């Protein structure tokens, strides 16, 4: 094998390791959050050594940033909601669509759902890595929440009020997504399927309409 061929094999091997680390990190961070997701567990799932994390990403923060970048891209590509669609609906319909989209991880276990779980973890355990990321690239869940709440608030509403309402709405689905496994156990014993998802959307929409001043 020539030196060039050896370099190509090494390059492919390095890229395979890099992709495996990002995939493993996504599942670990979705399950345990940034703080609870250890590099040791990530490398075990990726079948790589811990030095590979430093080599490819410069450390845990760099790896997490790559996961967040992938999450943002995936949510943009897979979202069935867009700002224009929200604007075309009535305020109540826009609210329901928003809630349903971000509650879907309760009944789906695809990669997009894992990304939403990561964002849900950040709602209670914000990491410095995430804070630095959202300054440059605010997650879609906040953009869409702001779009929805502005449909209910007066045009002259202070920016602070809009921000309060946006954060409040964004956190409605996050709680259920983040704590789904705990809520499925006693004493709550909630069952999450398509039918219960619709009932949850109905309930949260009803509460949210009252909270947004539109009973």
Predicted features along the sequence, with ranges:
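Helix-turn-helix
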Residues: 20, 28-62, 66, 70
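N-terminal intrinsically disordered/low-complexity leader segments
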Residues: 1-16
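An amphipathic alpha-helix adjacent to DNA-recognition modules
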Residues: 15-23, 56-84, 131, 135
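Hydrophobic alpha-helical segments that form the core
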Residues: 115-121, 158-180, 199-210
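Hydrophobic alpha-helical bundle segments that form small-molecule/ligand-binding pockets
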Residues: 138-163, 186, 212-215
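Amphipathic alpha-helical packing segments from all-alpha helical-bundle domains
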Residues: 76, 93, 127-153, 202, ...
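Hydrophobic alpha-helical connector segments
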Residues: 80-115, 162-169
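Amphipathic alpha-helical segments used for helix-helix packing
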Residues: 110-132, 180-186
